Amino acid sequence: MIPNGYLIFEDESFLDSTVAKMNALRKNGQFCDVRLQVCGHELMAHRAVLACCSPYLFEIFNSDLEPHGISHVKFEDLDPEAVEILLNYAYTAQLKADKELVKEVYSAAKRLKMDRVKQICGDYLLSKMDSQSAISYRNFASCMGDGRLLGKIDSYIQEHLLEVSEQEDFLKLPRLKLEVMLEDNLTLPSNGKLYSKVIGWVQRSLWENGEPLERLMEEVQTLYYSADHKLLDGSLLDGQAEVFGTEDDHIQFVQKKPPRENVHRQLSTSSSGSLSPGSTKHPCKQEWKYIASEKTTNNTYLCLAVLNGMLCVIFLHGRSSPQASPSATPCLTKSLSFEGQPLEEEPDKLLSPMHYARSGLGIASLNDQLIAAGGYNREECLRTVECYNIKTNSWTFIAPMRTPRARFQMAVLMGQLYVMGGSNGHSDELSCGETYNPNADEWTQVPELRTNRCNAGVCSLNNKLYVVGGSDPCGQKGLKNCDVFDPISKAWTNCAPLNIRRHQAAVCELDGFMYVIGGAESWNCLNSVERYNPENNTWTLIASMNIARRGAGVAVYEGKLFVVGGFDGSHALRCVEMYDPVRNEWRMLGSMNSPRSNAGAAVLNDVIYAIGGFDGNDFLNSVEAYNPKTEEWSTCADAFTDS
């Protein structure tokens, strides 16, 4: 067909033929310009091909000081056969791996940020999983930090706990043995509330008493379950018992507020995802989670849970006489007889994740809903926008932005959303902006900034939009610039510059002042905070945060600032701080369940939400929420229905 006089021809065999020839060139070492050294094995390839398939290698090649020479990339913790399989995939789009190598291919794909391959390998493992391999697969998924894979494996274990508990891997797990003494005519409840109290007791023992988890497992621990459904420490039954939970506690397992001296210990925990295939020592994240439970015989219960990042069996045995001293606790053996009673309560309903993983996104609360816009999901810069309905615990799409953008912030001004600057994934910085009208469900352009701005803070104050700081054109250092947009005159003006250059700072309004929190001057993270007074157009340095951070989220609740997560120069952070402007001081709060840098934070219905971000390994679509009244973070939706 020749429309308009032009010849158009499509060779359907060209692509297959070309990639086959390119792969042959690779195997013969012809025209190769990159050498991969994997545990003593040398693999040759073409830089352009690998850069298209691996964002990790793209970043390395893009920063190569000698772009026209041969690149050398060294891996000491990957399987050479797995990397060769990924190279074949990069050239042929065909993934062929023996079942014994799938975990190694997954690990290599994770390191190279080949997310599609990682997902395919994960799905394959799920298809082969049975009761015998479930624990092994869960350990692997946990150490890889794959929330999607973990969720599916945990669902399988919940449905097949009886069969799983009879397998060797399960029987080798660390075991916490609890003797729970009961008042007369009481039985232990077969539901999650009991295990919530138990996990709370373990956390308290570790964090307040400094008791190592291993020591708690050395001997039987005695607790007391009273008639009013309180779980008490059995060693304190002489009238000084401490209550560890009540019947109306939420069924949730969250990281409790640690003592001040433990904060720095938590921050130093590595969340690296670099794993050596076949290694048994993987750096797993700290986690507290109830997975599954079953009632066995004679008031005995079995629970699988994660305690401080360790997969454990909690074995509970109830005795009817509180005064009796337990002489023994039944041991879990392969011959245990189960009654097979179902759980009396359904598993906790989690906060629904976004449709897309997003880091460097814009977050705002508008019309009793949370709005998440743009961001990176590793593969691309997004322009999609999602809306969270707290009543239905669901995310739906609204009109997408006109321009893909990430590394920006979003603000609400006069009932509309505003986004300014950022990056579109191709150009480092944007000067354009948009505003969203919720009534029309559409985005329209607003006058551009005078200069391109990426990683700038955005805030509404006195019916005007402020854009503060950001990166210079080279992205190497922060800016002091502060620009103001008037939505009535649609004009930009300048205001006083910051005292300190900042990019990736958290920005918000509180009580008629604008706060600019943390960020980085160049690559050095800041803990300093500045406050802007629009009455006299001045910036004042106020009390500094406890932890220097950039890429943190910030939210305002009841006259205080809450700063969540961020990056300290080495690690994505879990820690949270609160600023009291009356006292001009910062206080550490309970940490989030996941580390999050470049996440969004917003308040809805008296609850602070942390959304998306990057945990040091993966881009996140997950959501967790903080109840300021209880000072606890949770991923459980039901925990906030009455908030």
UniProtKB/Swiss-Prot annotation:
CDD domains: BACK_NS1BP_IVNS1ABP (cd18502), BTB_POZ_NS1BP (cd18306). One of its GO terms (cellular component) is nucleus. It is found in: Cytoplasm; Cytoplasm, Cytoskeleton; Nucleus. Residues 257-282 are annotated as: Disordered. The keyword Heme does not apply. Gene3D superfamilies: 1.25.40.420, Kelch-type beta propeller, Potassium Channel Kv1.1, Chain A. GO terms for biological process: proteasome-mediated ubiquitin-dependent protein catabolic process. Plays a role in cell division and in the dynamic organization of the actin skeleton as a stabilizer of actin filaments by association with F-actin through Kelch repeats. This is Influenza virus NS1A-binding protein homolog A. It comes from Danio rerio. The lineage of its organism: Eukaryota, Metazoa, Chordata, Craniata, Vertebrata.
